[in-house]
Amino acid sequence: MASQYSSKHGTVSRPPYDLYLLFSDMRNFLNMLPEDKKQGVTADFDTLSATVQGFHVGVRVKSRVPYSLIELEDADAPFHFNVILHFDPTASAGQTDFHVDLAAELNLMLKMLLGNKIQGALDKIVDALVDISEGRMPEGIDPSQFPSGFGQ
């Protein structure tokens, strides 16, 4: 049975279509990584793969709903998982309610190692995207890799 995780919601200071376009191409993830983290990471439009702490992890786009959500699934990973990125419009024009859902089939050992860290990681992703959209770049992030005006 898969473990379910949901990030907190964050209001990103960009419209849903900007976020959708940013995340719909897996090559953008590679471009946003700091140079020292790019070794062993490859990407094309639909897939991204990396070796992290000796584990090979691959991700592929399962489905795209324009300007609303992107569903990702494992591709050659040590466990099965599914990620949904939500880009919901808010009452304020030009803002997005962003959140992430994750379902992962973790064995007992992985659940003990990763279970508590997954929730924190999902929340950090939301916080970082909110910060970037408001011009506060996390260390190691190159603002030139984002669409024009994204981090301003």
Which stretches of residues belong to each language-model region?
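Hydrophobic ligand-binding cavity/cleft-lining segments
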Residues: M1-T42, Q152
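Intrinsic-disorder/low-complexity, polar/charged segments enriched in Ser/Thr/Lys/Arg/Asp/Glu/Gln
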Residues: S3-H9, T47, H56, L69, ...
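Generic structural detector for well-ordered beta-strands
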Residues: H9-S13, R60, H86
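Hydrophobic pocket/interface hotspot
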Residues: L19-F23, F29, L48, V61, ...
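Conserved short hydrophobic interaction patches
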Residues: M26-M32, A121-A128, I132, R136
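Glycine-rich portal/gate segments that line the openings of hydrophobic small-molecule binding cavities
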Residues: L30-L33, K37-P78, F150-G151
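Beta-strand/loop substructures that line and gate deep hydrophobic ligand-binding cavities in soluble
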Residues: D76-D127, D131
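Short, highly charged C-terminal tails/helix-capping segments
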Residues: D127-Q152
